[in-house]
Amino acid sequence: MPIAQLYIIEGRTDEQKETLIRQVSEAMANSLDAPLERVRVLITEMPKNHFGIGGEPASKVRR
């Protein structure tokens, strides 16, 4: 069972996360020749101040 664990900065809509899940699942199923119904996708949303970019919190880097 292929599993993808994705970490994203909070703030995406439910629709965007649904699209992400669908597209990642399809890509994994196609590239691994796995049944789509066996693919799992886990999304962990991170607060901007818990995510670093270039040594700085994303809350300071991304506005």
Curated annotation (Swiss-Prot):
One of its GO terms (molecular function) is isomerase activity. Its EC number is 5.3.2.6. Pfam families: Tautomerase. It catalyses: (2Z,4E)-2-hydroxyhexa-2,4-dienedioate = (3E)-2-oxohex-3-enedioate. The active site is at 2 (proton acceptor). Pathway: Xenobiotic degradation; toluene degradation. SUPFAM superfamilies: Tautomerase/MIF (SSF55331). The keyword Cytoplasm does not apply. Keywords: Aromatic hydrocarbons catabolism, Isomerase, Plasmid. The keyword Isomerase applies. InterPro entries: 4-OT, 4-OT-like_dom, Tautomerase/MIF_sf. GO terms for biological process: toluene catabolic process. CDD domains: 4Oxalocrotonate_Tautomerase. It comes from the Bacteria. It is an enzyme of class 5 (isomerase). Belongs to the 4-oxalocrotonate tautomerase family. Catalyzes the ketonization of 2-hydroxymuconate stereoselectively to yield 2-oxo-3-hexenedioate. Homohexamer. This is 2-hydroxymuconate tautomerase. It comes from Pseudomonas sp. (strain CF600).
